[in-house]
Amino acid sequence: MSTKQVTCRYFLHGVCREGSRCLFSHDLNNSKPSTICKFYQRGVCAYGERCRYDHIKPSSRGGGGGAPEDQAGGGGAGGGGAGIGGAGGGPSVRGGMKKNLVLRDRVLGVDRVDRMFGAPADSMWSDVSTAAAPHSYVEAIRTGLDASAQDQATPPVCGPSQNLPQLCPYAANGHCFYEENCTYLHGDLCEVCGLQVLHPHDSEQRRAHEKMCLAAFEADMEKAFAAQLSQDKVCSICMEVVVQKANPSDRRFGILSSCCHTFCLACIRKWRCTRTFSNTIIKSCPECRVVSEFVIPSVYWVEDQEDKDHLIDLFKSGVSKKACKYFDQGRGSCPFGGKCLYLHAFPDGTRAEPDRPRKQLSSEGNVRFMNSVRLWDFIEEREQRSVPPLPALDDDMAELRELFMQMSGPSHDGPETPPTADQ
């Protein structure tokens, strides 16, 4: 099918910028597409009178033609009244929902502005605004954006809490533009958060909000106490106040899991990354020499053991979701094995089973556990093996030389010779 047989949709609205170069047809005689609003026919058009498409009701025979909205009673306020309680027969379910949604747009737009400036509101419009008020402003705006979801949605089961009036979301967030003229209910003021969020007639909602508000208030108080405790903590390595460092990214504590000495995260990580000392010295605290398995980064200083255990649990749970860079989704080998805190998983998401540690007996008789045997382990062990001092080696060579000279000397039958200086 050629594109010239398809009418340009932009030309229909007078906004085609291609002109004669357009690949689609600009001839309305060959193709007359339907400009009827399909959302209006479903009863979910959120634009109302501002819609650019034709609002035509479907005929009773199922055809595409019908009377436009202004002839059916939707063109003005009087037409709206005829559409709601029209004498031409009761409206269907879709027709009723359509009229309610069209009137919602008017209630949210023109009617409330008129009432703010003291204009007399029609009694019929007042009844419609009370009966057809949406549950929230967001719901009224989103109406018509997902027509299929609206058609398939089942009506909610009416309960005791759903019959209560809805709280105004703008008043709950701090300020409502309509104030006392607002259709929605303004809640009571909460003493903790200072917002109008307490429903006057729903005790369950009040208790739930007060409980949530108190929990948030306690969390904020704990953060305030932790910030106050961290104000004067000095790093034991760089001797600077951690929270007063010039670089904001350096204002973090490196909390050791086994001691309570204060270090900034950058200094303690630099200490533990050095290769000058043995592994035991690197993992120990620079002050008390207590070995700590890992360092927990924290914005606030934690000193209590219970709080530290909670922080360690949070740290482990967060780290366990990150992929291990040494394991590399099965392509590499992690030197920590089953003790690694990071995630060991393959590309398909399955977790790798931890390797069983293997025992190795060194030449000195020491037994150590290792996950994998590599050539580099033997080279590293040989380099770290202690070398005897040179004076002891010279003494051994001197003893061997003296023993050799004695064994290679003359027999006892001959005359004895005095020992030389070399011997």
Curated annotation (Swiss-Prot):
Residues 190-219 are annotated as: Makorin-type Cys-His. A zinc finger (RING-type) spans 235-289. It comes from the Eukaryota. PROSITE patterns: ZF_C3H1, ZF_RING_1, ZF_RING_2. Pfam families: zf-CCCH (PF00642), zf-CCCH_2 (PF14608). InterPro entries: MKRN-like, Znf_CCCH, Znf_CCCH_sf, Znf_RING, Znf_RING/FYVE/PHD, Znf_RING_CS. Pathway: Protein modification; protein ubiquitination. GO terms for biological process: cell differentiation; nervous system development; protein polyubiquitination. Residues 59-90 are annotated as: Disordered. A zinc finger (C3H1-type) spans 2-29, 31-58, 162-189, 318-347. GO terms for cellular component: cytoplasm; nucleus. Keywords: Cytoplasm, Developmental protein, Differentiation, Metal-binding, Neurogenesis, Nucleus, Repeat, Transcription, Transcription regulation, Transferase, Ubl conjugation pathway, Zinc, Zinc-finger. Residues 61-90 have a biased composition (Gly residues). It is found in: Cytoplasm; Nucleus. Its EC number is 2.3.2.27. Its main location: cytoplasm. E3 ubiquitin ligase catalyzing the covalent attachment of ubiquitin moieties onto substrate proteins. Inhibits neurogenesis and axis formation during embryonic development by modulating the phosphatidylinositol 3-kinase (PI3K) pathway. Acts downstream of PI3K and akt1 to up-regulate gsk3b mRNA expression. This is E3 ubiquitin-protein ligase makorin-2.
